[in-house]
């Protein structure tokens, strides 16, 4: 995702901030997971109806009126109901507000399938920072600990979006060349970081399942314990490279046990 110009340059963080005011909303529990009272779980795509553009519990996550939105919808694919994303020089996502304590639900599991890589995509360069798939987790925290630059970004986000910027986010991405476990930082703020979990073409066109300990990933990336999880999101973007891409997302869930 790349945004040009002084106003457009904060669109990613503005998009993340969009859900800052939604943190207190609790989604119904996901089938098959026992969730403590007062906590939410991720609504599964597999229980949505084919043709639905907005699965129950999920919200559109548009970055800017100047940027085309990626199209999402529930489809039947290989005998399963999954979320399909189609990006055409576009960038947007879907998100679900949550209220989860990482120490109680430390593990996130998801599935995705990518038909092809995005030519020219390079999330390290800041020029072609697109990814066919992203799973994004946002966290609350003590914003008084943010440095001057991050406070300035937060104020700008508040000005442009009317929403508070989350304390921190992790984006799990598929990269063209960088090896798995590579950590990348957002160009404008240290409070949004990417973690490469898949790279290169070797496992294209197949369903891949990932399970991550968000506590461990957060500790490694931010050097402190993770605060409450306030939303989970998915995003497929191709606007930086001016290309088209598609991808499939299976159910996402948080769980207690490894």
Question: Residue locations for each model-derived region?
Answer:
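Extracellular beta-strand elements of beta-rich domains used
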Residues: 45, 232, 252-254
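Extracellular/luminal beta-rich ligand-recognition
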Residues: 130, 140-188
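Extracellular carbohydrate-recognition regions
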Residues: 23-64, 148-155
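Extracellular-facing segments of soluble proteins and assemblies that are Gly/Ser/Thr-biased and enriched
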Residues: 104-154, 158
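C-terminal motif of bacterial Sec signal peptides marking the signal peptidase cleavage site
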Residues: 18-21
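Extracellular beta-strand ligand-recognition surfaces/modules
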Residues: 26-30, 133-135, 190-200, 204-242
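Extracellular/lumenal carbohydrate-interaction signature centered on repeated Trp-anchored short motifs
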Residues: 97-108, 201-204
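Short carbohydrate-recognition loop motifs
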Residues: 70-92
